[in-house]
């Protein structure tokens, strides 16, 4: 039996899979802790998986974690260090909360489920996305996998060649901090909605917009594809998500698009 675990950044969960890749059981931490969006180490979910399926620690062959925590930590810290002292608050926050981040995954397993920490493996974040897509695909061979994310390990987007589930080759990646996902979250924040929560509202509101408007053209100009270098490019001076924990956009974005919406002011249809 194998256990897959996610946590610390988004809603935590744990899944039990057999040797054939068949999903046996699954729990979201929030359903057990009764804390909406619970992103803590999913100790209740793992405990429930083991107890509900009459398993012991020795019955678990491997535990897979969905990213490589140290890689993620170091890449964001490295980028922030290039912009000191402006990024001091972000760096301080990262190191201050080190023991509550995914870097502590190994220690949490050792503390809560002694023995499982020795079976822990870390999966590349974008590989995890690709493997998840494969699990729901009727086709398992000769596939092109496109992952567009906020950030994972070192990349924010990737393209991979899937020869079969055991042979996956990454062909292209977009390195942090340029990120289509974080760009979307920044616009979500600018419009007065919560990051990682209000993006669906922006998606819904976009249907009422005008893609030919001056404002739409200004927004589309913030990020582009450079066909010569095959890179996603962005003018990072408009963004602060790689520098701050409290604000994702700079004053320059407000100069370009106008004042950001106050989240406490009701939306009035125009």
Q: Where does each model-flagged region fall?
A:
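Short acidic/glycine-rich loops and adjacent helix/strand connectors
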Residues: 1-270
């Amino acid at each position: 039996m194998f256990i897959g675990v996610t946590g610390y950044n988004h809603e935590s969960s744990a899944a039990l899979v057999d040797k054939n890749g068949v999903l046996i059981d699954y729990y979201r931490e929030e359903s057990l802790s009764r804390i909406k969006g619970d992103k803590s180490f999913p100790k209740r979910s793992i405990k429930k998986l083991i107890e509900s399926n009459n398993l012991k620690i020795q019955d678990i062959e491997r535990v897979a974690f969905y990213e490589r925590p140290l890689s993620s930590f170091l890449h964001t810290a490295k980028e922030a260090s290039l912009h000191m002292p402006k990024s001091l608050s972000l760096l301080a926050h990262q190191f201050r909360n080190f023991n509550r981040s995914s870097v502590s995954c190994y220690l949490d397993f050792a503390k809560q489920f002694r023995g499982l920490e020795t079976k822990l493996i870390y999966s590349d974040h974008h590989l995890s996305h690709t493997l998840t897509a494969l699990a729901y695909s009727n086709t398992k061979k000769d596939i092109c996998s496109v992952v567009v994310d906020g950030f994972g390990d070192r990349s924010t987007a990737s393209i991979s060649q899937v020869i079969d589930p055991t042979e996956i080759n990454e062909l292209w990646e977009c390195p942090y901090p340029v990120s289509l996902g974080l760009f979307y979250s920044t616009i979500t924040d600018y419009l007065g909605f919560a990051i990682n929560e209000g993006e669906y509202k922006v998606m819904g509101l976009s249907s009422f917009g005008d893609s030919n408007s001056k404002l739409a053209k200004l927004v589309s100009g913030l990020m582009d594809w450079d066909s010569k270098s095959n890179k996603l490019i962005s003018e990072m001076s408009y963004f602060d998500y790689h520098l701050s924990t409290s604000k994702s956009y700079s004053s320059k974005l407000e100069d370009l698009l106008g004042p950001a919406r106050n989240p406490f002011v009701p939306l009035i249809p125009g």
